[in-house]
Amino acid sequence: MNLKILGIDPGSRNCGYAIIEANKGKNILIEAGLIKIKPSTLQYQITELCEGLDLIFKNHSFDEVAIEDIFFAYNPKTVLKLAQFRGALSLKILQIHGDFAEYTPLQVKKAVTGKAKATKEQVAFMVKRLLGLSKDIKPLDITDAIAVALTHAANLRVRV
């Protein structure tokens, strides 16, 4: 059974997204990109993020949605801002799609590379390899989103 999965890597400057089709252990990248968030007031940035997500859902339907949880940051302002973006994304996904899966950065790294402490570059290398792509995927926000989708696909196979 083919499953269309949306993976999301939330960020305060860019939000990576990836759409994969998963079928019996074979994953195909359908689309990947960024929701670019321009420097502005927090309210405008959140609006921009939600509008970008609306557009993705308008152009595609999904069986599953997975999002990466926010990472630990040392700057409290950064944590608060990311938490607000994450909250807005969560609400938007719940309104449009319903339930979604959440994975920590360590879970994603472990699922894709086998190492919970892998670097972003190691994740990018494995994403490229797992999908059989010839070109590097840039920026790393996009590879992270693909990794989230791949993690969810692997998790679904384990549960089935």
UniProtKB/Swiss-Prot annotation:
Cofactor(s) annotated in UniProt: Mg(2+)
InterPro entries, sorted: RNaseH-like_sf (IPR012337), RNaseH_sf (IPR036397), X-over_junc_endoDNase_Mg_BS (IPR020563), X-over_junc_endoDNase_RuvC (IPR002176)
MF annotations from Gene Ontology: crossover junction DNA endonuclease activity; DNA binding; magnesium ion binding
One Pfam family matching this protein: RuvC
Enzyme class: hydrolase
Biological processes, Gene Ontology terms: DNA recombination; DNA repair
Cellular component, GO, one term: cytoplasm
Co-factor remark: Binds 2 Mg(2+) ion per subunit.
Residues that, per the record, bind Mg(2+) 1: D9, D141
EC assignment: 3.1.21.10
Superkingdom assignment: Bacteria
Active site per UniProt: D9, E68, D141
Residues where Mg(2+) 2 binds: E68
Subcellular location: Cytoplasm
Keywords noted in UniProt: Cytoplasm, DNA damage, DNA recombination, DNA repair, DNA-binding, Endonuclease, Hydrolase, Magnesium, Metal-binding, Nuclease
Primary subcellular site in the record, as a coarse category: cytoplasm
Annotated PANTHER family: CROSSOVER JUNCTION ENDODEOXYRIBONUCLEASE RUVC
Family: Belongs to the RuvC family.
Function description: The RuvA-RuvB-RuvC complex processes Holliday junction (HJ) DNA during genetic recombination and DNA repair. Endonuclease that resolves HJ intermediates. Cleaves cruciform DNA by making single-stranded nicks across the HJ at symmetrical positions within the homologous arms, yielding a 5'-phosphate and a 3'-hydroxyl group; requires a central core of homology in the junction. The consensus cleavage sequence is 5'-(A/T)TT(C/G)-3'. Cleavage occurs on the 3'-side of the TT dinucleotide at the point of strand exchange.
Subunit structure comment from the entry: Homodimer which binds Holliday junction (HJ) DNA. The HJ becomes 2-fold symmetrical on binding to RuvC with unstacked arms; it has a different conformation from HJ DNA in complex with RuvA. In the full resolvosome a probable DNA-RuvA(4)-RuvB(12)-RuvC(2) complex forms which resolves the HJ.
Protein known as: Crossover junction endodeoxyribonuclease RuvC
Gene label: ruvC
